[in-house]
């Protein structure tokens, strides 16, 4: 009888041990399932988040500049006087990108901003006075070229040595361009991309070089910047289909 009671106790202990073991297994399995579901969810979110970028990159990679011919927009050449502050005359030998800026001078036109660059020639040879741009686009969409494309401009910091710079006028502090300014910018950038076979990903904002809020509207509204680059791609593809 004592032996039977001992056997019963042993069985109960074994049963409790098995229950605890089963409970641990179930807990581990539950945690593993939850982790797996979380990983799958994160994967789906990541794919959804980056797929537009992949699509955009694919569109860019499809461009064949040998089949594209973008006509030169109407440009008024009003080159700056050579000087140490705004037109040093340093050769720009390898053009790999285009940098978009805004003037940060609301309501002014292309001529006024060009003349501001010109006025730097009378300033001391100091860093604070070194400023210019290859092109300025006015509120009315007119384009003034201040510096030849084969010379550097003092506009984009460390990217001065390999990029073309474009300053855009804007009517107010928001930095948003007028429709005419925007259309001229799309045309000019498309023309430069075609001429120098520049990838769309190398059409950048001043912000992308220095983190400066320039061009303000495109920095504050990155979706508008993406749309702008898409408009360039669309413009180039349209010209490709016309050839």
Which residues does each predicted region cover?
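Short coil-to-beta-strand
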Residues: 157-165
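Solvent-exposed, acidic/flexible segments
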Residues: 93, 128, 159, 174-182
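Generic recognition of cysteine residues
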Residues: 123, 146, 168-169, 193, ...
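Metal-dependent polysaccharide deacetylase catalytic core of the NodB/CE4 family, i.e.
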Residues: 153, 168-173
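Soluble periplasmic/extracytoplasmic beta-strand elements of cell-envelope proteins
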Residues: 99, 136, 165-167, 204
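N-terminal catalytic cores of peptidoglycan-degrading enzymes
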Residues: 2-156
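Basic/polar, cationic surfaces and motifs that engage anionic cell-wall
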Residues: 19, 25, 46-74, 172-243
């Amino acid at each position: 009888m004592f032996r039977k009671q001992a056997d019963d106790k042993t069985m109960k202990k074994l049963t409790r041990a098995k229950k605890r073991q089963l409970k641990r297994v179930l807990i581990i399995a539950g945690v593993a399932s939850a982790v797996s579901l979380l990983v799958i969810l994160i994967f789906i979110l990541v794919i959804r988040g980056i797929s537009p970028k992949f699509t955009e990159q694919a569109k860019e990679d499809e461009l064949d500049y040998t089949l594209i011919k973008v006509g030169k927009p109407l440009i008024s050449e009003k080159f700056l006087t050579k000087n140490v502050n705004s037109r040093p005359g340093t050769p720009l030998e390898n053009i790999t990108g285009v940098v978009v800026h805004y003037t940060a001078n609301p309501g002014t036109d292309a001529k006024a901003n060009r003349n501001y660059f010109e006025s730097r020639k009378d300033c001391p040879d100091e860093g604070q006075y070194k400023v210019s741009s290859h092109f300025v686009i006015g509120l009315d969409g007119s384009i003034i070229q201040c510096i030849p494309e084969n010379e550097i401009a003092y506009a984009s910091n460390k990217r001065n040595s390999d990029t073309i710079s474009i300053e855009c006028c804007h009517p107010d502090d928001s930095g948003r361009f007028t429709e005419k300014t925007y259309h001229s910018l799309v045309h000019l950038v498309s023309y430069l991309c075609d001429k120098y076979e520049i990838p769309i990903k190398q059409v950048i904002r001043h912000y992308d070089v220095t983190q400066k809020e320039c061009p303000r509207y495109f920095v504050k509204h990155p979706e508008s910047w993406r749309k702008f680059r898409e408009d360039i791609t669309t413009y180039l593809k349209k010209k490709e289909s016309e050839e």
